[in-house]
C-alpha cells in the first residue's frame, strides 16, 4: 500500500533558542505538563530502544515513573528481553512521541539498576492486581494460551487475598543516566526546530540541528 500522500502541515509554532532553559529537564517538565494538560493518552509513555548481542535494535513502549537530576526511571521484569539486552549493553534510547502537540523528545544515556529499597517502595505503591500480575508473567517467554496467565492470576489472587504481595526477586527498575536530549518541534514547510543538549561536566551544551 502506498501511503506517501498521508501528510499534513505542522502549524503549532516554533521553538526558539532564546527560550531554552540551561537544563533540559526544565523544558522536559514544561512539555510534559503541557502534554498532560492537553489530555494526551499516556503522556508518560516512551519508546525504549535497546540492542541485542547481534546488533539488532529492539523497541517497546514503557511508562516513565520518575525523573529528576539523577535521570529517568522505569520498572520491568528483570527476565525480560530488554533487561537481558541491557545487561550486555547498558546504552539506551528513549523517545516521547507527543504527536498531537507536534513534539517529540529523544533521550540517550546508560542505565543503572535501582536499589532494592527503591524498587520495593514503588512496587508496593502499585494496585494489588498489578503486583500480582508481576508474579504471573515470565515476560518475553513463549506461552501456549492466554488462559495460562489468567489461571495463574486467579490462583495467586486467592493466595495473596489476605496479605501483602511480596516483591518478586525477578522484578526491578532502571535509572537512565542522561547523556543527550533532543527536543523536536514541528514547523511550517517541514522546517522543524531541533535543539540538542549534550552533557558537559556539570552543565549542558546546546546546539540547533537542521531538520
Swiss-Prot record:
The keyword Oxidoreductase applies. Keywords: Flavoprotein, FMN, Oxidoreductase, Pyridoxine biosynthesis. GO terms for molecular function: FMN binding; pyridoxamine phosphate oxidase activity. Catalyzes the oxidation of either pyridoxine 5'-phosphate (PNP) or pyridoxamine 5'-phosphate (PMP) into pyridoxal 5'-phosphate (PLP). It catalyses: pyridoxamine 5'-phosphate + O2 + H2O = pyridoxal 5'-phosphate + H2O2 + NH4(+); pyridoxine 5'-phosphate + O2 = pyridoxal 5'-phosphate + H2O2. PROSITE patterns: PYRIDOX_OXIDASE (PS01064). Belongs to the pyridoxamine 5'-phosphate oxidase family. Its cofactor is FMN. FMN binds at residues 60-65, 75-76, 81-82, 104, 139-140, 184, 194. Its EC number is 1.4.3.5. Pfam families: PNP_phzG_C (PF10590), PNPOx_N (PF01243). GO terms for biological process: pyridoxine biosynthetic process. InterPro entries: Pyridox_Oxase (IPR000659), Pyridox_Oxase_CS (IPR019740), Pyridox_Oxase_N (IPR011576), Pyridoxamine_oxidase_dimer_C (IPR019576), Split_barrel_FMN-bd (IPR012349). It is an enzyme of class 1 (oxidoreductase). Substrate binds at residues 7-10, 65, 122, 126, 130, 190-192. The keyword Flavoprotein applies. PANTHER family: PYRIDOXINE-5'-PHOSPHATE OXIDASE, PYRIDOXINE-5-PHOSPHATE OXIDASE. Pathway: Cofactor metabolism; pyridoxal 5'-phosphate salvage; pyridoxal 5'-phosphate from pyridoxamine 5'-phosphate: step 1/1; Cofactor metabolism; pyridoxal 5'-phosphate salvage; pyridoxal 5'-phosphate from pyridoxine 5'-phosphate: step 1/1. Binds 1 FMN per subunit. This is Pyridoxine/pyridoxamine 5'-phosphate oxidase. Homodimer.
